[in-house]
């Protein structure tokens, strides 16, 4: 049984364009100074936000599966394959399968906030695939509602989003009452608090804190009404050698 908590102040920090875009990183790059590095097949996770709006210029990616979830506002994406700007609004999701190589530019509009997460889909295979891009509006992502919580499934059962990375499930949970969440004990469950305060078993976390739950079959979630969690479940030990373990 294991619950690791990474407070916001323990996470790596980043910025672009003289602070026009700011980041806290629950999972930092290997060279970053935050306490949590890559594990499972999660390589990187940033929470990025901008009050004024800003664009990150064209830059390359290879191999990794890079997803962005819009928490607030909107983002735009341009890449060297499709050669046009495409937009995603609040609640939407975009997937870049960078494969053998693609360059892209990204814009956060004014007062926007996103997660950007890099998954390791098995680079031995992905580097030999053609790059691709897809995006999904919030309306196509299924939501299950009961008296205790609503669960939006971004990746997983009944979602149109398909990732190459093994065993990934992504959900956004809005808490109405305290409830028990069933878990797969063979998976690592990575939890970011989007808003509010919650207690996971006996661990208290609040907005922008991060927790990793391992070797648990269930977890008690007690939270303020309308607290919101973003949860990624991933195999604790993937069936392939990841970049970080190569």
Give residue spans per PLM region:
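Jelly-roll (double-stranded beta-helix
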Residues: 1-246
């Amino acid at each position: 049984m294991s619950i690791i908590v990474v407070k916001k102040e323990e996470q790596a920090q980043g910025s672009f364009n003289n602070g026009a875009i700011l980041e806290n990183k629950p999972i930092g790059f290997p060279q970053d100074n935050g306490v949590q590095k890559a594990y499972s097949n999660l390589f990187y996770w940033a929470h990025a936000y901008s009050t004024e709006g800003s664009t990150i210029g064209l830059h390359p990616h290879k191999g990794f599966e890079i997803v962005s979830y819009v928490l607030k506002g909107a983002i735009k994406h341009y890449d060297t394959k499709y050669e046009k700007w495409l937009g995603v609004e609040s609640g939407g999701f975009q997937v870049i399968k960078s494969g053998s190589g693609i360059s892209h530019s990204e814009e956060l509009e004014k007062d926007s906030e996103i997660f950007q997460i890099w998954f390791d889909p098995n680079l031995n295979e992905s580097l030999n695939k053609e790059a691709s891009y897809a995006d999904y509006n919030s309306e196509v992502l299924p939501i299950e509602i009961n008296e205790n919580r609503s669960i939006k499934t971004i990746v997983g059962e009944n979602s149109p989003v398909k990732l190459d990375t093994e065993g990934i499930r992504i959900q956004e949970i809005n808490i109405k009452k305290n409830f028990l969440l069933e878990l797969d004990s063979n998976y690592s469950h990575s939890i970011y608090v989007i808003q509010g305060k919650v207690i996971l078993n006996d661990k208290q976390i609040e907005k922008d804190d991060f927790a990793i739950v391992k070797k648990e079959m269930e977890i008690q979630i007690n939270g303020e009404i309308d607290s919101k969690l973003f949860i990624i479940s991933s195999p604790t030990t993937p069936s392939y050698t990841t970049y970080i373990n190569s």
